[in-house]
Amino acid sequence: MIPLPLLEIIPYIILFIYGTIVGSFLNVCIYRIPEGQSIVKNPSHCMTCGNRLKWYDMVPVFSWLILGGKCRNCKAPISPQYPLIEAANGLLYLWIVGVNGWNAQSLVYTLMASALLTLSIIDWRTYEIPVQINLFLAALGILATILDVPHLVSHLIGAAAISVPLWLLYLLTKGAAIGGGDIKLMAACGLILGWQNIVLAFLLACILGSFIHLLRMKLTGAGKTLAMGPYLSAGIFVTALYGQTWIHQYLALLGM
């Protein structure tokens, strides 16, 4: 007989493994989407020698460790990004379910987290958020709204609460102050989270982005241009899990 504590842990182990498998697919998206390549047609292969990978070369995290971070065929180094993204996605899934429980909303949040992780890496490297990912997030927003019909108005307002002011800023500055991808991201995730959460997410993103980028400018000489995607994603993710709690605590302090 399997001990009860172990039975309780097994679903989380399965969830983590599933998250790493999805993380493996995210790596494909991270490399191929910016290059305009198909994420489903071409088989996985070594980026150096082009050798097609066997299934045992693609076991999330473990294959990279077993191979010593090198291609089995040509021995070229394999970026540590692969196991890091796989493990990070698995941990994000555990975090979401650990805080939010096993429910439909958590399913939406896990898919959202994977999309945010993917676009963060791509935006950090290219200063562009792929429209495909924003469309995927918009579809999640529609699903989240359907699952939360009693708060339909909040979701609809959320889609415009930050994106419309950013769009006006985009027009006034002719795109110098904010990117179109950031606007679409806030519209899609505003639909997912509702207006209160998306406003808080944006405030957190601005604080985080300002602090970290100023630090990078001082320590590494980074330029003034920054990719907002990673910071917006961080604000969105944290607010999805803790936003309502923080908002209620703040209102309680105000006696409201």
Predicted regions and their residues:
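Long, highly hydrophobic alpha-helical transmembrane signal-anchor segments
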Residues: M1-P34
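Functional transmembrane core segments of multi-pass inner-membrane proteins
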Residues: S106-S210, L214, Q249-M256
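Transmembrane helix-loop-helix
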Residues: I96-V108
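Interfacial loop-to-transmembrane junctions
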Residues: L215-V238
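Membrane-proximal soluble regions of multi-pass membrane proteins
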Residues: L26-Q81
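Residue-level signature of transmembrane alpha-helical entry/exit and packing/kink sites
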Residues: E8-F16, Y82, E86, Q105, ...
